[in-house]
Design a protein with these regions (language model features):
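Short acidic/histidine-rich motifs immediately flanking catalytic phosphotransfer sites
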Residues: 62-69
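Short glycine-rich anion-binding loops that position phosphate/pyrophosphate groups of nucleotides
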Residues: 10-12, 74-77, 100-102
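Short, glycine-/small-residue-rich phosphate/pyrophosphate-handling segment
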Residues: 104-147
C-alpha cells in the first residue's frame, strides 16, 4: 500500500469558511474522506500547521519513508527558502498543489520558492488539485519518469 502524506500550510485549516469564492465551501476534512474512498490502494495521512517550522519537521519526518507528499504550503510557497531546502533534503517526491490559480491572483503570489524543489506543480483545479496529485503519486510510472526528469 502506498503511503501519501498531505501537508497543508497556513490558513488552510479555514477551508470552507475562508474566502469561499476563492477556496469553495467544503472543509478539507470532508474532502479528505472522499480522497481516502477514491484511493483505497493508498494510505493517506493528513497534517496541517500554520507554523513554518512544524511543516518542515513533518517533511523531515515522512520524507524518507513515504511514497509521496502533497504539499500546499499556502503563503509560505512565496516566501520560504527553508521549505525549499527541506524538500530538497528528502528523497520522497513532493507535488506542490494550490486550490486556486495563483497566477490569476495578486502578483506577489506569482513566484513560488518551492516549485523548483518539487517533482511537479498542480494548481487552479480547486480541491481536485489534491486528487490529481495523489493520482500521479500513486502511479508507479510517475516515480520512474520523474526520477529521469529530475536527475
Amino acid at each position: 500500500m502506498k503511503k501519501i502524506q498531505i501537508i497543508n500550510g497556513p490558513n488552510l485549516n479555514l477551508l470552507g469558511k475562508r474566502e469561499p469564492t476563492v477556496y469553495g465551501n467544503a472543509s478539507f476534512e470532508d474532502y479528505l474522506s472522499e480522497l481516502r474512498a477514491r484511493f483505497p490502494q493508498c494510505e493517506i495521512s493528513y497534517y496541517q500547521s500554520n507554523v513554518e517550522g512544524e511543516i518542515i519537521n513533518k517533511i523531515h519526518e515522512v520524507g524518507f519513508e513515504y511514497d509521496g507528499i502533497v504539499l500546499n504550503a499556502g503563503a509560505y510557497t512565496h516566501t520560504s527558502i527553508a521549505l525549499h531546502d527541506a524538500i530538497k533534503a528528502v528523497t520522497t517526491p513532493v507535488v506542490e498543489v494550490h486550490i486556486s490559480n495563483v497566477h490569476a491572483r495578486e502578483s506577489f503570489r506569482h513566484v513560488s520558492m518551492i516549485s523548483a524543489a518539487c517533482r511537479g506543480v498542480i494548481l487552479g483545479f480547486g480541491l481536485d488539485s489534491y486528487r490529481l496529485a495523489i493520482d500521479r503519486l500513486c502511479d508507479r510510472r510517475f516515480r520512474r519518469l520523474s526520477n529521469r526528469i529530475n536527475n
